[in-house]
Amino acid sequence: LDFFLGGAKYQRSRIYLGSKAGEFFLKQTPDFDKDKDFEDVDAALFDFDGDGDKDLYIVSGGSDNMELDKYLTDRIYINNGKGEFNLSGQKLPDVDHKISTGTASFEDIDKDGDLDIFVGERLKINNYGLPSSGFMLVNDGKGNFSNQTQKLSPELNEIGMITDSEFSDIDNDG
């Protein structure tokens, strides 16, 4: 069993690998050192590249960034299967601007065999308290994502401040 700790702004994230004896050891991750200026708000593990191991999606946010700030970009780190993570060159679509993300969840929402992403905006930069939006990013099967929110769930526009999300079949309809 292993675990991830996201870093605050100017503090690097950390991964701890567990041993069979139940101890945890810090795994040095150079790309986390490079990205310590980001503020990690949430994180999730999912198999982004379909190779059977868990990759890492880190949600970036904060209220002191400007709307076009690069530090509002969510990041994907690819696991090489040995617990070593490297920043992916894969770019996620800007949903319409850089956002202060609060959460991300993963599910095959279009039932095509790959994972898609829901991204929830925590707050409007320089406009705290205004309604924020949710976004459905659909995977084309090759790791390229497109914003399909208007097609799949337009009511996610300015729904409110989104702090958490989870996919589940609540009504048992598949």
Regions found by a protein language model. Name each.
Residues D2-G7, L56-S60, I117-E121, S165:
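Hydrophobic beta-strand segments that make up the repeating blades of beta-propeller
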Residues L1, L17, E39-G50, L92-P93, ...:
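Beta-propeller blade termini
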Residues F3, L17-F38, Y77-I99, L137-G160:
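Blade-edge motifs of beta-propeller repeat domains
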Residues A8-Q11, M66-L72, N126-S132:
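Short, solvent-exposed loop/turn segments at conserved positions within beta-propeller repeat blades
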Residues F25, T29-G81, F85-L87:
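A generic tandem-repeat structural signature
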Residues S13-I15, L56, D74-I76, G134-M136:
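Hydrophobic beta-strand positions in blades of beta-propellers and related beta-sheet-rich domains
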Residues A8, F48, G61-G62, I109, ...:
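Flexible loop residues that form catalytic
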Residues H97, K111, G120-F135:
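Surface loops at the rim/top face of extracytoplasmic beta-rich domains
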